[in-house]
């Protein structure tokens, strides 16, 4: 019998706010444990939450990016459960009136994955297990960090579709300025709800939830493993238990964590300390008007205007920084082809050599365009351009100033170049004779000797012209 896998995803993204959703503690990643906390996010008695309006605005922006409808009034609810990383013993979330509903993401195949809703909530803390101390430690820095939970419908049927959905959703959230979606820092986390059923059947099977997925590769492996596990159980006549499972990517297997709760288990009720959130149509339109260009529109513009290949476009769209760098570089140098080549080939090489990631890059995006102009005008050669670009990327150097200070500009003094060529010809009479006898390889040898004599500070085209004139 053939089986169909049915997948729905719950994706949590951290919103790009400076402070937490209900207090003024910073959201910065990587602080010393339990230093970004206050009585509000620790849930101490007598404290009251104050809603961060920036979190609401970013959530509306996310909803608009995915084509959601924005609720004119939404509200918060308390989700009650006990866990060590949740000091209040409840999480402020949205169940009954979420902010955004009925959006979608379209895959390359044309298939639409529906988004049921997006709702705001606060993050919990983080548990860290210390084998040396034989203790589990709690870091509450993450408590109260604003999250947007994006809940899809169960519209995906393979690991590949689920990963593509995650990639497109991440791209959408990053380019709309909602979240940096860095999985390694936990600012994008995905829970997988999965069931299997005989092909052609409409009734859904018993689902499990998979957690601890810290990369798209882990998500793909976990989906394939869980689908195979459930099919094996069905074929053996065993019952699938509705449960939450933890994925161990190193071992390539999942383990039961706890029985899967239903909504009723959390005893939701309206949050009494936060009034309903009203969003006027005028505010929604203001946010829409200030939205950055979204990925689909940017891809279409590049391919229509610059005739970029899909491969080049995909690489340039790997981060908002490289996309902006391409647009700014093209505007300065006028050549989309040159801009794409430097960003897609030279930039990764520089980053690798410096042990940096694209997130570490922090240079003036116009610098590359100015550098390409210097190369095109003959002020520097390509080898020098590569050296200067490395300094631009790693030290935010200004190309023209760096070239001037380090004497890297090409010689433009025709007399000096011709003097060097004459010396080379006098020292290599045999090669000169070979060239005059029709051996073209000798000419290339002479160009190399001239370039060496000039210390590489002349263009090969200028040297070739002088050599032809004097030989």
Region spans (language model):
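Basic, nucleic-acid-interacting segments
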Residues: 1-293, 304, 308-310, 331-335
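Amphipathic alpha-helical core segments of compact helical bundles
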Residues: 16, 193, 197, 228, ...
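Core structural elements
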Residues: 186-198, 303-327, 336-354, 366-368, ...
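Active-site lining segments that contact anionic ligands and/or coordinate catalytic metals
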Residues: 263-265, 297-299, 311, 353, ...
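Structural motif
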Residues: 330-339, 379-380, 437-441
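Strongly charged, low-complexity linkers/loops
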Residues: 358-369, 373, 382-452
């Amino acid at each position: 019998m053939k089986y169909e896998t049915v997948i729905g995803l719950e994706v949590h993204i951290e919103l790009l706010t400076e402070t937490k959703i209900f207090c003024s503690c910073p959201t910065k990643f990587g602080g010393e444990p339990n230093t970004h906390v206050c009585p509000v996010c620790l849930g101490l008695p007598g404290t009251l939450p104050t809603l961060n309006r920036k979190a609401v605005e970013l959530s509306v922006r996310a909803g608009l990016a995915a084509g959601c409808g924005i609720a004119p009034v939404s509200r918060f609810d308390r989700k009650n459960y006990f866990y060590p990383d949740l000091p209040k013993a409840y999480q402020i979330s949205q169940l009954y009136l979420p902010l955004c509903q009925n959006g979608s993401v379209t895959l390359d195949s044309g298939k639409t994955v529906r988004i049921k809703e997006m709702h705001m909530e606060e993050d919990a803390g983080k548990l860290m297990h210390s084998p040396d101390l034989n203790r589990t430690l709690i870091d509450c820095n993450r408590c109260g960090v604003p999250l947007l939970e994006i809940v899809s419908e169960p519209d995906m049927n393979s690991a590949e579709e689920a990963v593509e959905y995650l990639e497109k959703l991440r791209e959408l959230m990053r380019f709309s300025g909602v979240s940096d979606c860095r999985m390694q820092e936990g600012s994008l986390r995905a829970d997988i709800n999965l069931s299997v059923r005989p092909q052609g059947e409409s009734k859904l099977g018993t689902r499990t939830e998979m957690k601890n997925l810290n990369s798209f590769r882990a998500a793909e492996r976990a989906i394939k493993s869980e689908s195979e596990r459930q099919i094996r159980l069905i074929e053996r006549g065993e019952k699938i238990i509705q449960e939450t499972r933890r994925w161990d990517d190193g071992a390539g297997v999942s383990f039961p964590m706890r029985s899967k709760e239903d909504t009723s288990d959390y005893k939701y009720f309206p949050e009494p300390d936060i009034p309903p959130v009203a969003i006027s149509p005028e505010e929604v339109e203001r946010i829409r008007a200030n939205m950055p260009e979204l990925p689909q529109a940017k891809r279409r513009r590049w391919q229509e205007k610059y005739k970029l290949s899909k491969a080049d476009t995909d690489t340039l769209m790997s981060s908002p920084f490289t996309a902006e760098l391409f647009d700014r570089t093209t505007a300065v140098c006028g050549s989309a082809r040159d801009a794409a080549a430097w960003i897609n080939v030279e930039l990764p090489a520089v980053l690798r050599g410096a042990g940096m990631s694209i997130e570490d890059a922090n240079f003036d995006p116009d610098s590359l365009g100015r550098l390409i102009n210097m190369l095109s005008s003959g002020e520097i050669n390509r080898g020098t351009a590569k050296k200067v670009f490395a300094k631009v990327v790693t030290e935010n150097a200004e190309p023209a100033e760096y070239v001037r200070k380090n004497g890297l500009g090409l010689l433009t003094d025709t007399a000096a170049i011709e003097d060097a060529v004459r010396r080379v010809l006098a020292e290599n009479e045999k090669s000169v004779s070979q060239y005059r006898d029709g051996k073209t390889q000798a000419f290339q040898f002479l160009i190399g000797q001239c370039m060496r004599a000039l210390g590489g500070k002349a263009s090969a085209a200028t040297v070739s012209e002088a050599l032809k004139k004097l030989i």
